[in-house]
């Protein structure tokens, strides 16, 4: 889906890693939540509270998912799932546009 209708957008940005990763929170009438953001090239580690679906809209990165022994390459148009209460690592190779859906 390239467009969301009838949503609430939180005006203040979520800013991480000194601006290397930024996003805006979108809340749907149903109560479900997503963030739309941009990641600059760099190495990042995130911790989840809820399970997440990370959709990479453009760009490319490598992800090390919880329990994995090797990095997985993800490009624009691909996605990956992250379990709740877990940590995952990213090596962002180019400016990356993403949509994160919170699944819990």
Curated annotation (Swiss-Prot):
Top EC category: transferase
UniProt EC number: 2.4.2.1, 2.4.2.2
GO cellular component: cytosol
SUPFAM superfamilies: RmlC-like cupins (SSF51182)
Gene3D superfamilies registered for this protein in UniProt: Jelly Rolls
GO MF annotations in UniProt: guanosine phosphorylase activity; purine-nucleoside phosphorylase activity; thymidine phosphorylase activity; uridine phosphorylase activity
InterPro entries registered for this protein in UniProt: Ppnp, RmlC-like_jellyroll, RmlC_Cupin_sf
Reactions performed catalytically: a purine D-ribonucleoside + phosphate = a purine nucleobase + alpha-D-ribose 1-phosphate; adenosine + phosphate = alpha-D-ribose 1-phosphate + adenine; cytidine + phosphate = cytosine + alpha-D-ribose 1-phosphate; guanosine + phosphate = alpha-D-ribose 1-phosphate + guanine
Keywords, alphabetical: Glycosyltransferase, Transferase
Function: Catalyzes the phosphorolysis of diverse nucleosides, yielding D-ribose 1-phosphate and the respective free bases. Can use uridine, adenosine, guanosine, cytidine, thymidine, inosine and xanthosine as substrates. Also catalyzes the reverse reactions.
HAMAP family: Nucleos_phosphorylase_PpnP
Family, similarity comment: Belongs to the nucleoside phosphorylase PpnP family.
Identification of the protein by name: Pyrimidine/purine nucleoside phosphorylase
The species this protein was found in: Geotalea uraniireducens (strain Rf4) (Geobacter uraniireducens)
């Amino acid at each position: 889906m390239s467009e969301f209708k009838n949503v609430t957008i939180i005006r203040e940005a979520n800013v991480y890693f000194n601006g290397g990763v930024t996003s805006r929170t979108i809340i749907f009438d149903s109560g479900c939540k997503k963030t739309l953001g941009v990641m600059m090239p760099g190495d990042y580690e995130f911790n989840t509270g809820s399970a997440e679906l990370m959709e990479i809209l453009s760009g490319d990165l490598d992800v090390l998912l919880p329990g994995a022994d090797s990095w997985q390459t993800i490009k624009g148009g691909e996605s990956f799932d992250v379990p709740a209460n877990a940590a995952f690592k990213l090596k962002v190779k180019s400016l990356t546009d993403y949509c994160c859906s919170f699944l819990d």
